Amino acid sequence: MHGGVTASTVQFSPTVPNMSPITDAVVLGGNGGLVFRWSGQKCCAVQVELNYMQRGWREANEEGAYARALHYIELPFLMHIYFGSPTVRGFVNLGPQIGYCVYDNSGIGTKQTSEVHQYNPIEKPFDWGIAGGLGFYVRSRKAGLYQLEVRYNYSLGTLFDNSLSAHFRNSNPMELSVNLAWLWEFKR
């Protein structure tokens, strides 16, 4: 099992004027889930996770602020490459991830109108993208593995319609997360 902190935003194209500074656009949230890893080779493994992830974005202007929270159930399928001693190992995780938005609040803050496209309910709750992470773990003889990972997820799917007649060409969520994990090893 693992849990951590997520910093997320959404890349809009055309850009949203109120999100110009990146610090105004980032929303902090939490994440947690289950990790399943199968090591069949000397230096690599397959890792599958089932995660609950909080995402969103924030805007600020002279009239006030707007924040949006999106909660996802995610399923990353990762290639896990590790190196180092049997006790302390570094690793790289890389692979695709899919997800589904299970909660979308309508926003907190300034007046919401349908004229501002990013304030509308999301149109595409299904998400897919690429995840990559770096980290290390320490193996304990009796208490399993303790792992620290920094991961970046970039969604290739969009939150809103991106057809030729749509307002946004892109509305891709992205997040950076820091996770601590505790894993148990089962021998064959």
Task: Give the location of each predicted region.
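Predominantly the C-terminal beta-signal and adjacent terminal strand-loop region
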Residues: E49, I122-G132, F136-R188
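Gram-negative (and chloroplast) outer-membrane scaffold detector with strong preference
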Residues: V5-Q11, F36-T110, S140-K142, L176-E185
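Residues that define the transmembrane beta-barrel architecture of outer-membrane proteins
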Residues: D24-G30, A69-I73, V88, K124-I130, ...
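Extracellular loop and loop/strand-boundary signature of outer-membrane beta-barrel proteins
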Residues: P17-I22, A60-Y66, S114-I122, S163-N170
